[in-house]
């Protein structure tokens, strides 16, 4: 766990990259985010979970939990090389068409057609296949119950010198594990509370998106549970334990 003091001149304002209320800093190759709710511990738990998965380490951002100017939060290493730019799906679509990808939803009669439009769009305009990326993202979100996977939390990386694109590592998982869920009731069981979770961006159902793309990766469940049992008790730890336990045979 880190503990750092950062001056205000290191604050960075980034438009259109997430729900957007966390204070962000950049210093010596690290991004820092202070908590609005309890995003830091959730980011840590979710990214640590992925170290027990079959995903390559370059395909997700690893977050550390700690203190920033006395407040809880998290940090992660800058994954962009010089000459590379992170551009969200929302911004890419708006640059090319003048319309937000999120509002295109109302033009389609089904989740499937909305997904197909999005996949085809990135293939056509960026020569980028995003299917594997989305398969991995929605496998993770199905397990961790991410409720903030809007199109500013999905992104591509542009090699500005060669004008080529690749998918970004998975980032921004802080609104997972019932964190920030406005329907959460402490008196209800985890099983009851997760019934109220609403997914993004193609459907309100995590299962529907998972079923469309299929399983993106596997997790060493027993090893992950062994690790979680060493973590301090919290709602988020308990939700993750529950989700791993009920999805042991995820296919």
Predicted feature residues:
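Conserved ATP-binding subdomain of kinase catalytic cores across diverse folds
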Residues: 1-101
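Regulatory N- and C-terminal appendages and interdomain linkers associated
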Residues: 1-13, 22, 42, 124, ...
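Hydrophobic transmembrane signal anchors and adjacent membrane-proximal interface regions, especially
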Residues: 4, 12, 101-106, 199-200, ...
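C-terminal catalytic region of ATP-dependent kinase domains
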Residues: 35-36, 161-251
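Short C-terminal domain-edge/linker segments immediately following a structured domain
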Residues: 61-65, 106-109, 198-204
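Short catalytic/ligand-binding loop motif for oxyanion handling, primarily in non-cytosolic enzymes
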Residues: 72, 83-85, 158-160, 177-179
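ATP-dependent phospho-/nucleotidyl transfer catalytic cores
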Residues: 79-138, 246
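Conserved kinase catalytic-core segment
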Residues: 112-177
């Amino acid at each position: 766990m880190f503990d750092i003091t950062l001056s205000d001149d290191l604050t960075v304002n980034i438009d259109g990259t997430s729900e957007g209320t966390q204070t962000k800093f950049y210093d010596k190759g690290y991004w820092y985010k202070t908590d609005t709710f309890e995003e830091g511990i959730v980011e840590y738990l979710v990214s640590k979970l992925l170290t027990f998965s079959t995903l390559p380490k370059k395909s997700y951002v690893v977050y550390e939990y700690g203190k920033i100017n006395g407040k809880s939060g998290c940090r992660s290493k800058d994954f962009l090389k010089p000459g590379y730019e992170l551009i969200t799906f929302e911004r890419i679509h708006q640059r090319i068409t003048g319309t937000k990808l999120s509002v295109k939803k109302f033009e389609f009669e089904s989740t499937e057609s909305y997904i197909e439009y999005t996949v085809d769009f990135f293939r056509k305009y960026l020569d980028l296949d995003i299917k594997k990326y989305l398969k991995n993202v929605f496998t993770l979100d199905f397990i961790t119950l991410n409720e903030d996977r809007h199109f500013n939390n999905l992104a591509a990386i542009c090699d500005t010198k060669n004008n080529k694109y690749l998918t970004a590592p998975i980032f921004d998982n802080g609104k997972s594990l019932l964190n920030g869920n406005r329907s959460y009731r402490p008196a209800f069981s985890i099983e009851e509370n997760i019934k109220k979770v609403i997914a993004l961006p193609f459907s309100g159902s995590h299962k529907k998106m998972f079923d469309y793309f299929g399983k993106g990766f596997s997790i060493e469940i027993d090893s992950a549970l062994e690790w979680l049992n060493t973590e301090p008790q919290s709602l988020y730890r308990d939700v993750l334990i529950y989700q791993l336990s009920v999805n042991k045979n995820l296919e």
